[in-house]
Amino acid sequence: MPLAPPANSVETMASLMPLSPYLSPTVLLLVSCDLGFVRADRPPSPVNVTVTHLRANSATVSWDVPEGNIVIGYSISQQRQNGPGQRVIREVNTTTRACALWGLAEDSDYTVQVRSIGLRGESPPGPRVHFRTLKGSDRLPSNSSSPGDITVEGLDGERPLQTGEVVIIVVVLLMWAAVIGLFCRQYDIIKDNDSNNNPKEKGKGPEQSPQGRPVGTTRQKKSPSINTIDV
């Protein structure tokens, strides 16, 4: 009965067997180099992920990207806890470091994770951040935002006028002043014409004779009438 070869002889035979063409050392080396380049080109995960401007139905998530990395976009995974509602927001060709989350349910718990998008793919997910939306009646105080937070201004806030707006207002005021001045000038001209025509009409009266009597008028004298009756 033939005896099985020892373990060391089996390893020796396996080492002497030719490798398959698909597993040649050259191919393995190229694959390992390619994987190394892809991993090197992927951006790192975002840092300092925070959620601010909490509202009943919206919030704002912001993050930072380590310097020296090429980032062309971001991907945000939003998940509602204890309920359906998963959303992925993806945007490329942008350098923004903040995103508004909308359509949230009030008084609910959510988690978000941010990924950076580079030329060779996405980074690993950043830290998971938990937040809770407010109730419909709750409002944040006006001084709750820190200097580094992204501010969202309402439409009713005071805003200084821009240069273009000031120019438009000045032009409109000048046009109104010109129209009012033209109207006043035309009114003065019409008033002067009326005042020049009235004295001529008032000076005209009935023509008078050299004796001071008006021409065309006769003075009738009344004489007593006498009636004679013959008997």
Curated annotation (Swiss-Prot):
Keyword Ribosomal protein: no
Phenotype when the gene is knocked out: Knockout animals show no overt phenotype.
Domain Fibronectin type-III: 43-136
Glycosylation sites: N48, N143
Signal peptide: 1-40
Residues in compartment: Extracellular: 41-163
Pfam family, one: fn3
Region (Disordered): 118-156, 193-231
Biased composition (Basic and acidic residues): 193-205
Chain ranges on the Cytoplasmic side, renumbered to this chain: 185-231
Cysteine pairs bridged by disulfides in the record: none
UniProtKB keywords: Glycoprotein, Membrane, Secreted, Signal, Transmembrane, Transmembrane helix
Tissue localization of expression: Predominantly expressed in the liver and in the brain, including in the cortex, hypothalamus and hippocampus. Also expressed in heart, lung, kidney and testis. In the colon, expressed in the epithelium and in a subset of immune cells in lymphoid aggregates.
GO cellular component, one term: endoplasmic reticulum
Membrane spanning stretches: 164-184
Single GO BP term: negative regulation of inflammatory response
Name of this protein: Fibronectin type III domain-containing protein 4
Source species of the chain: Mus musculus
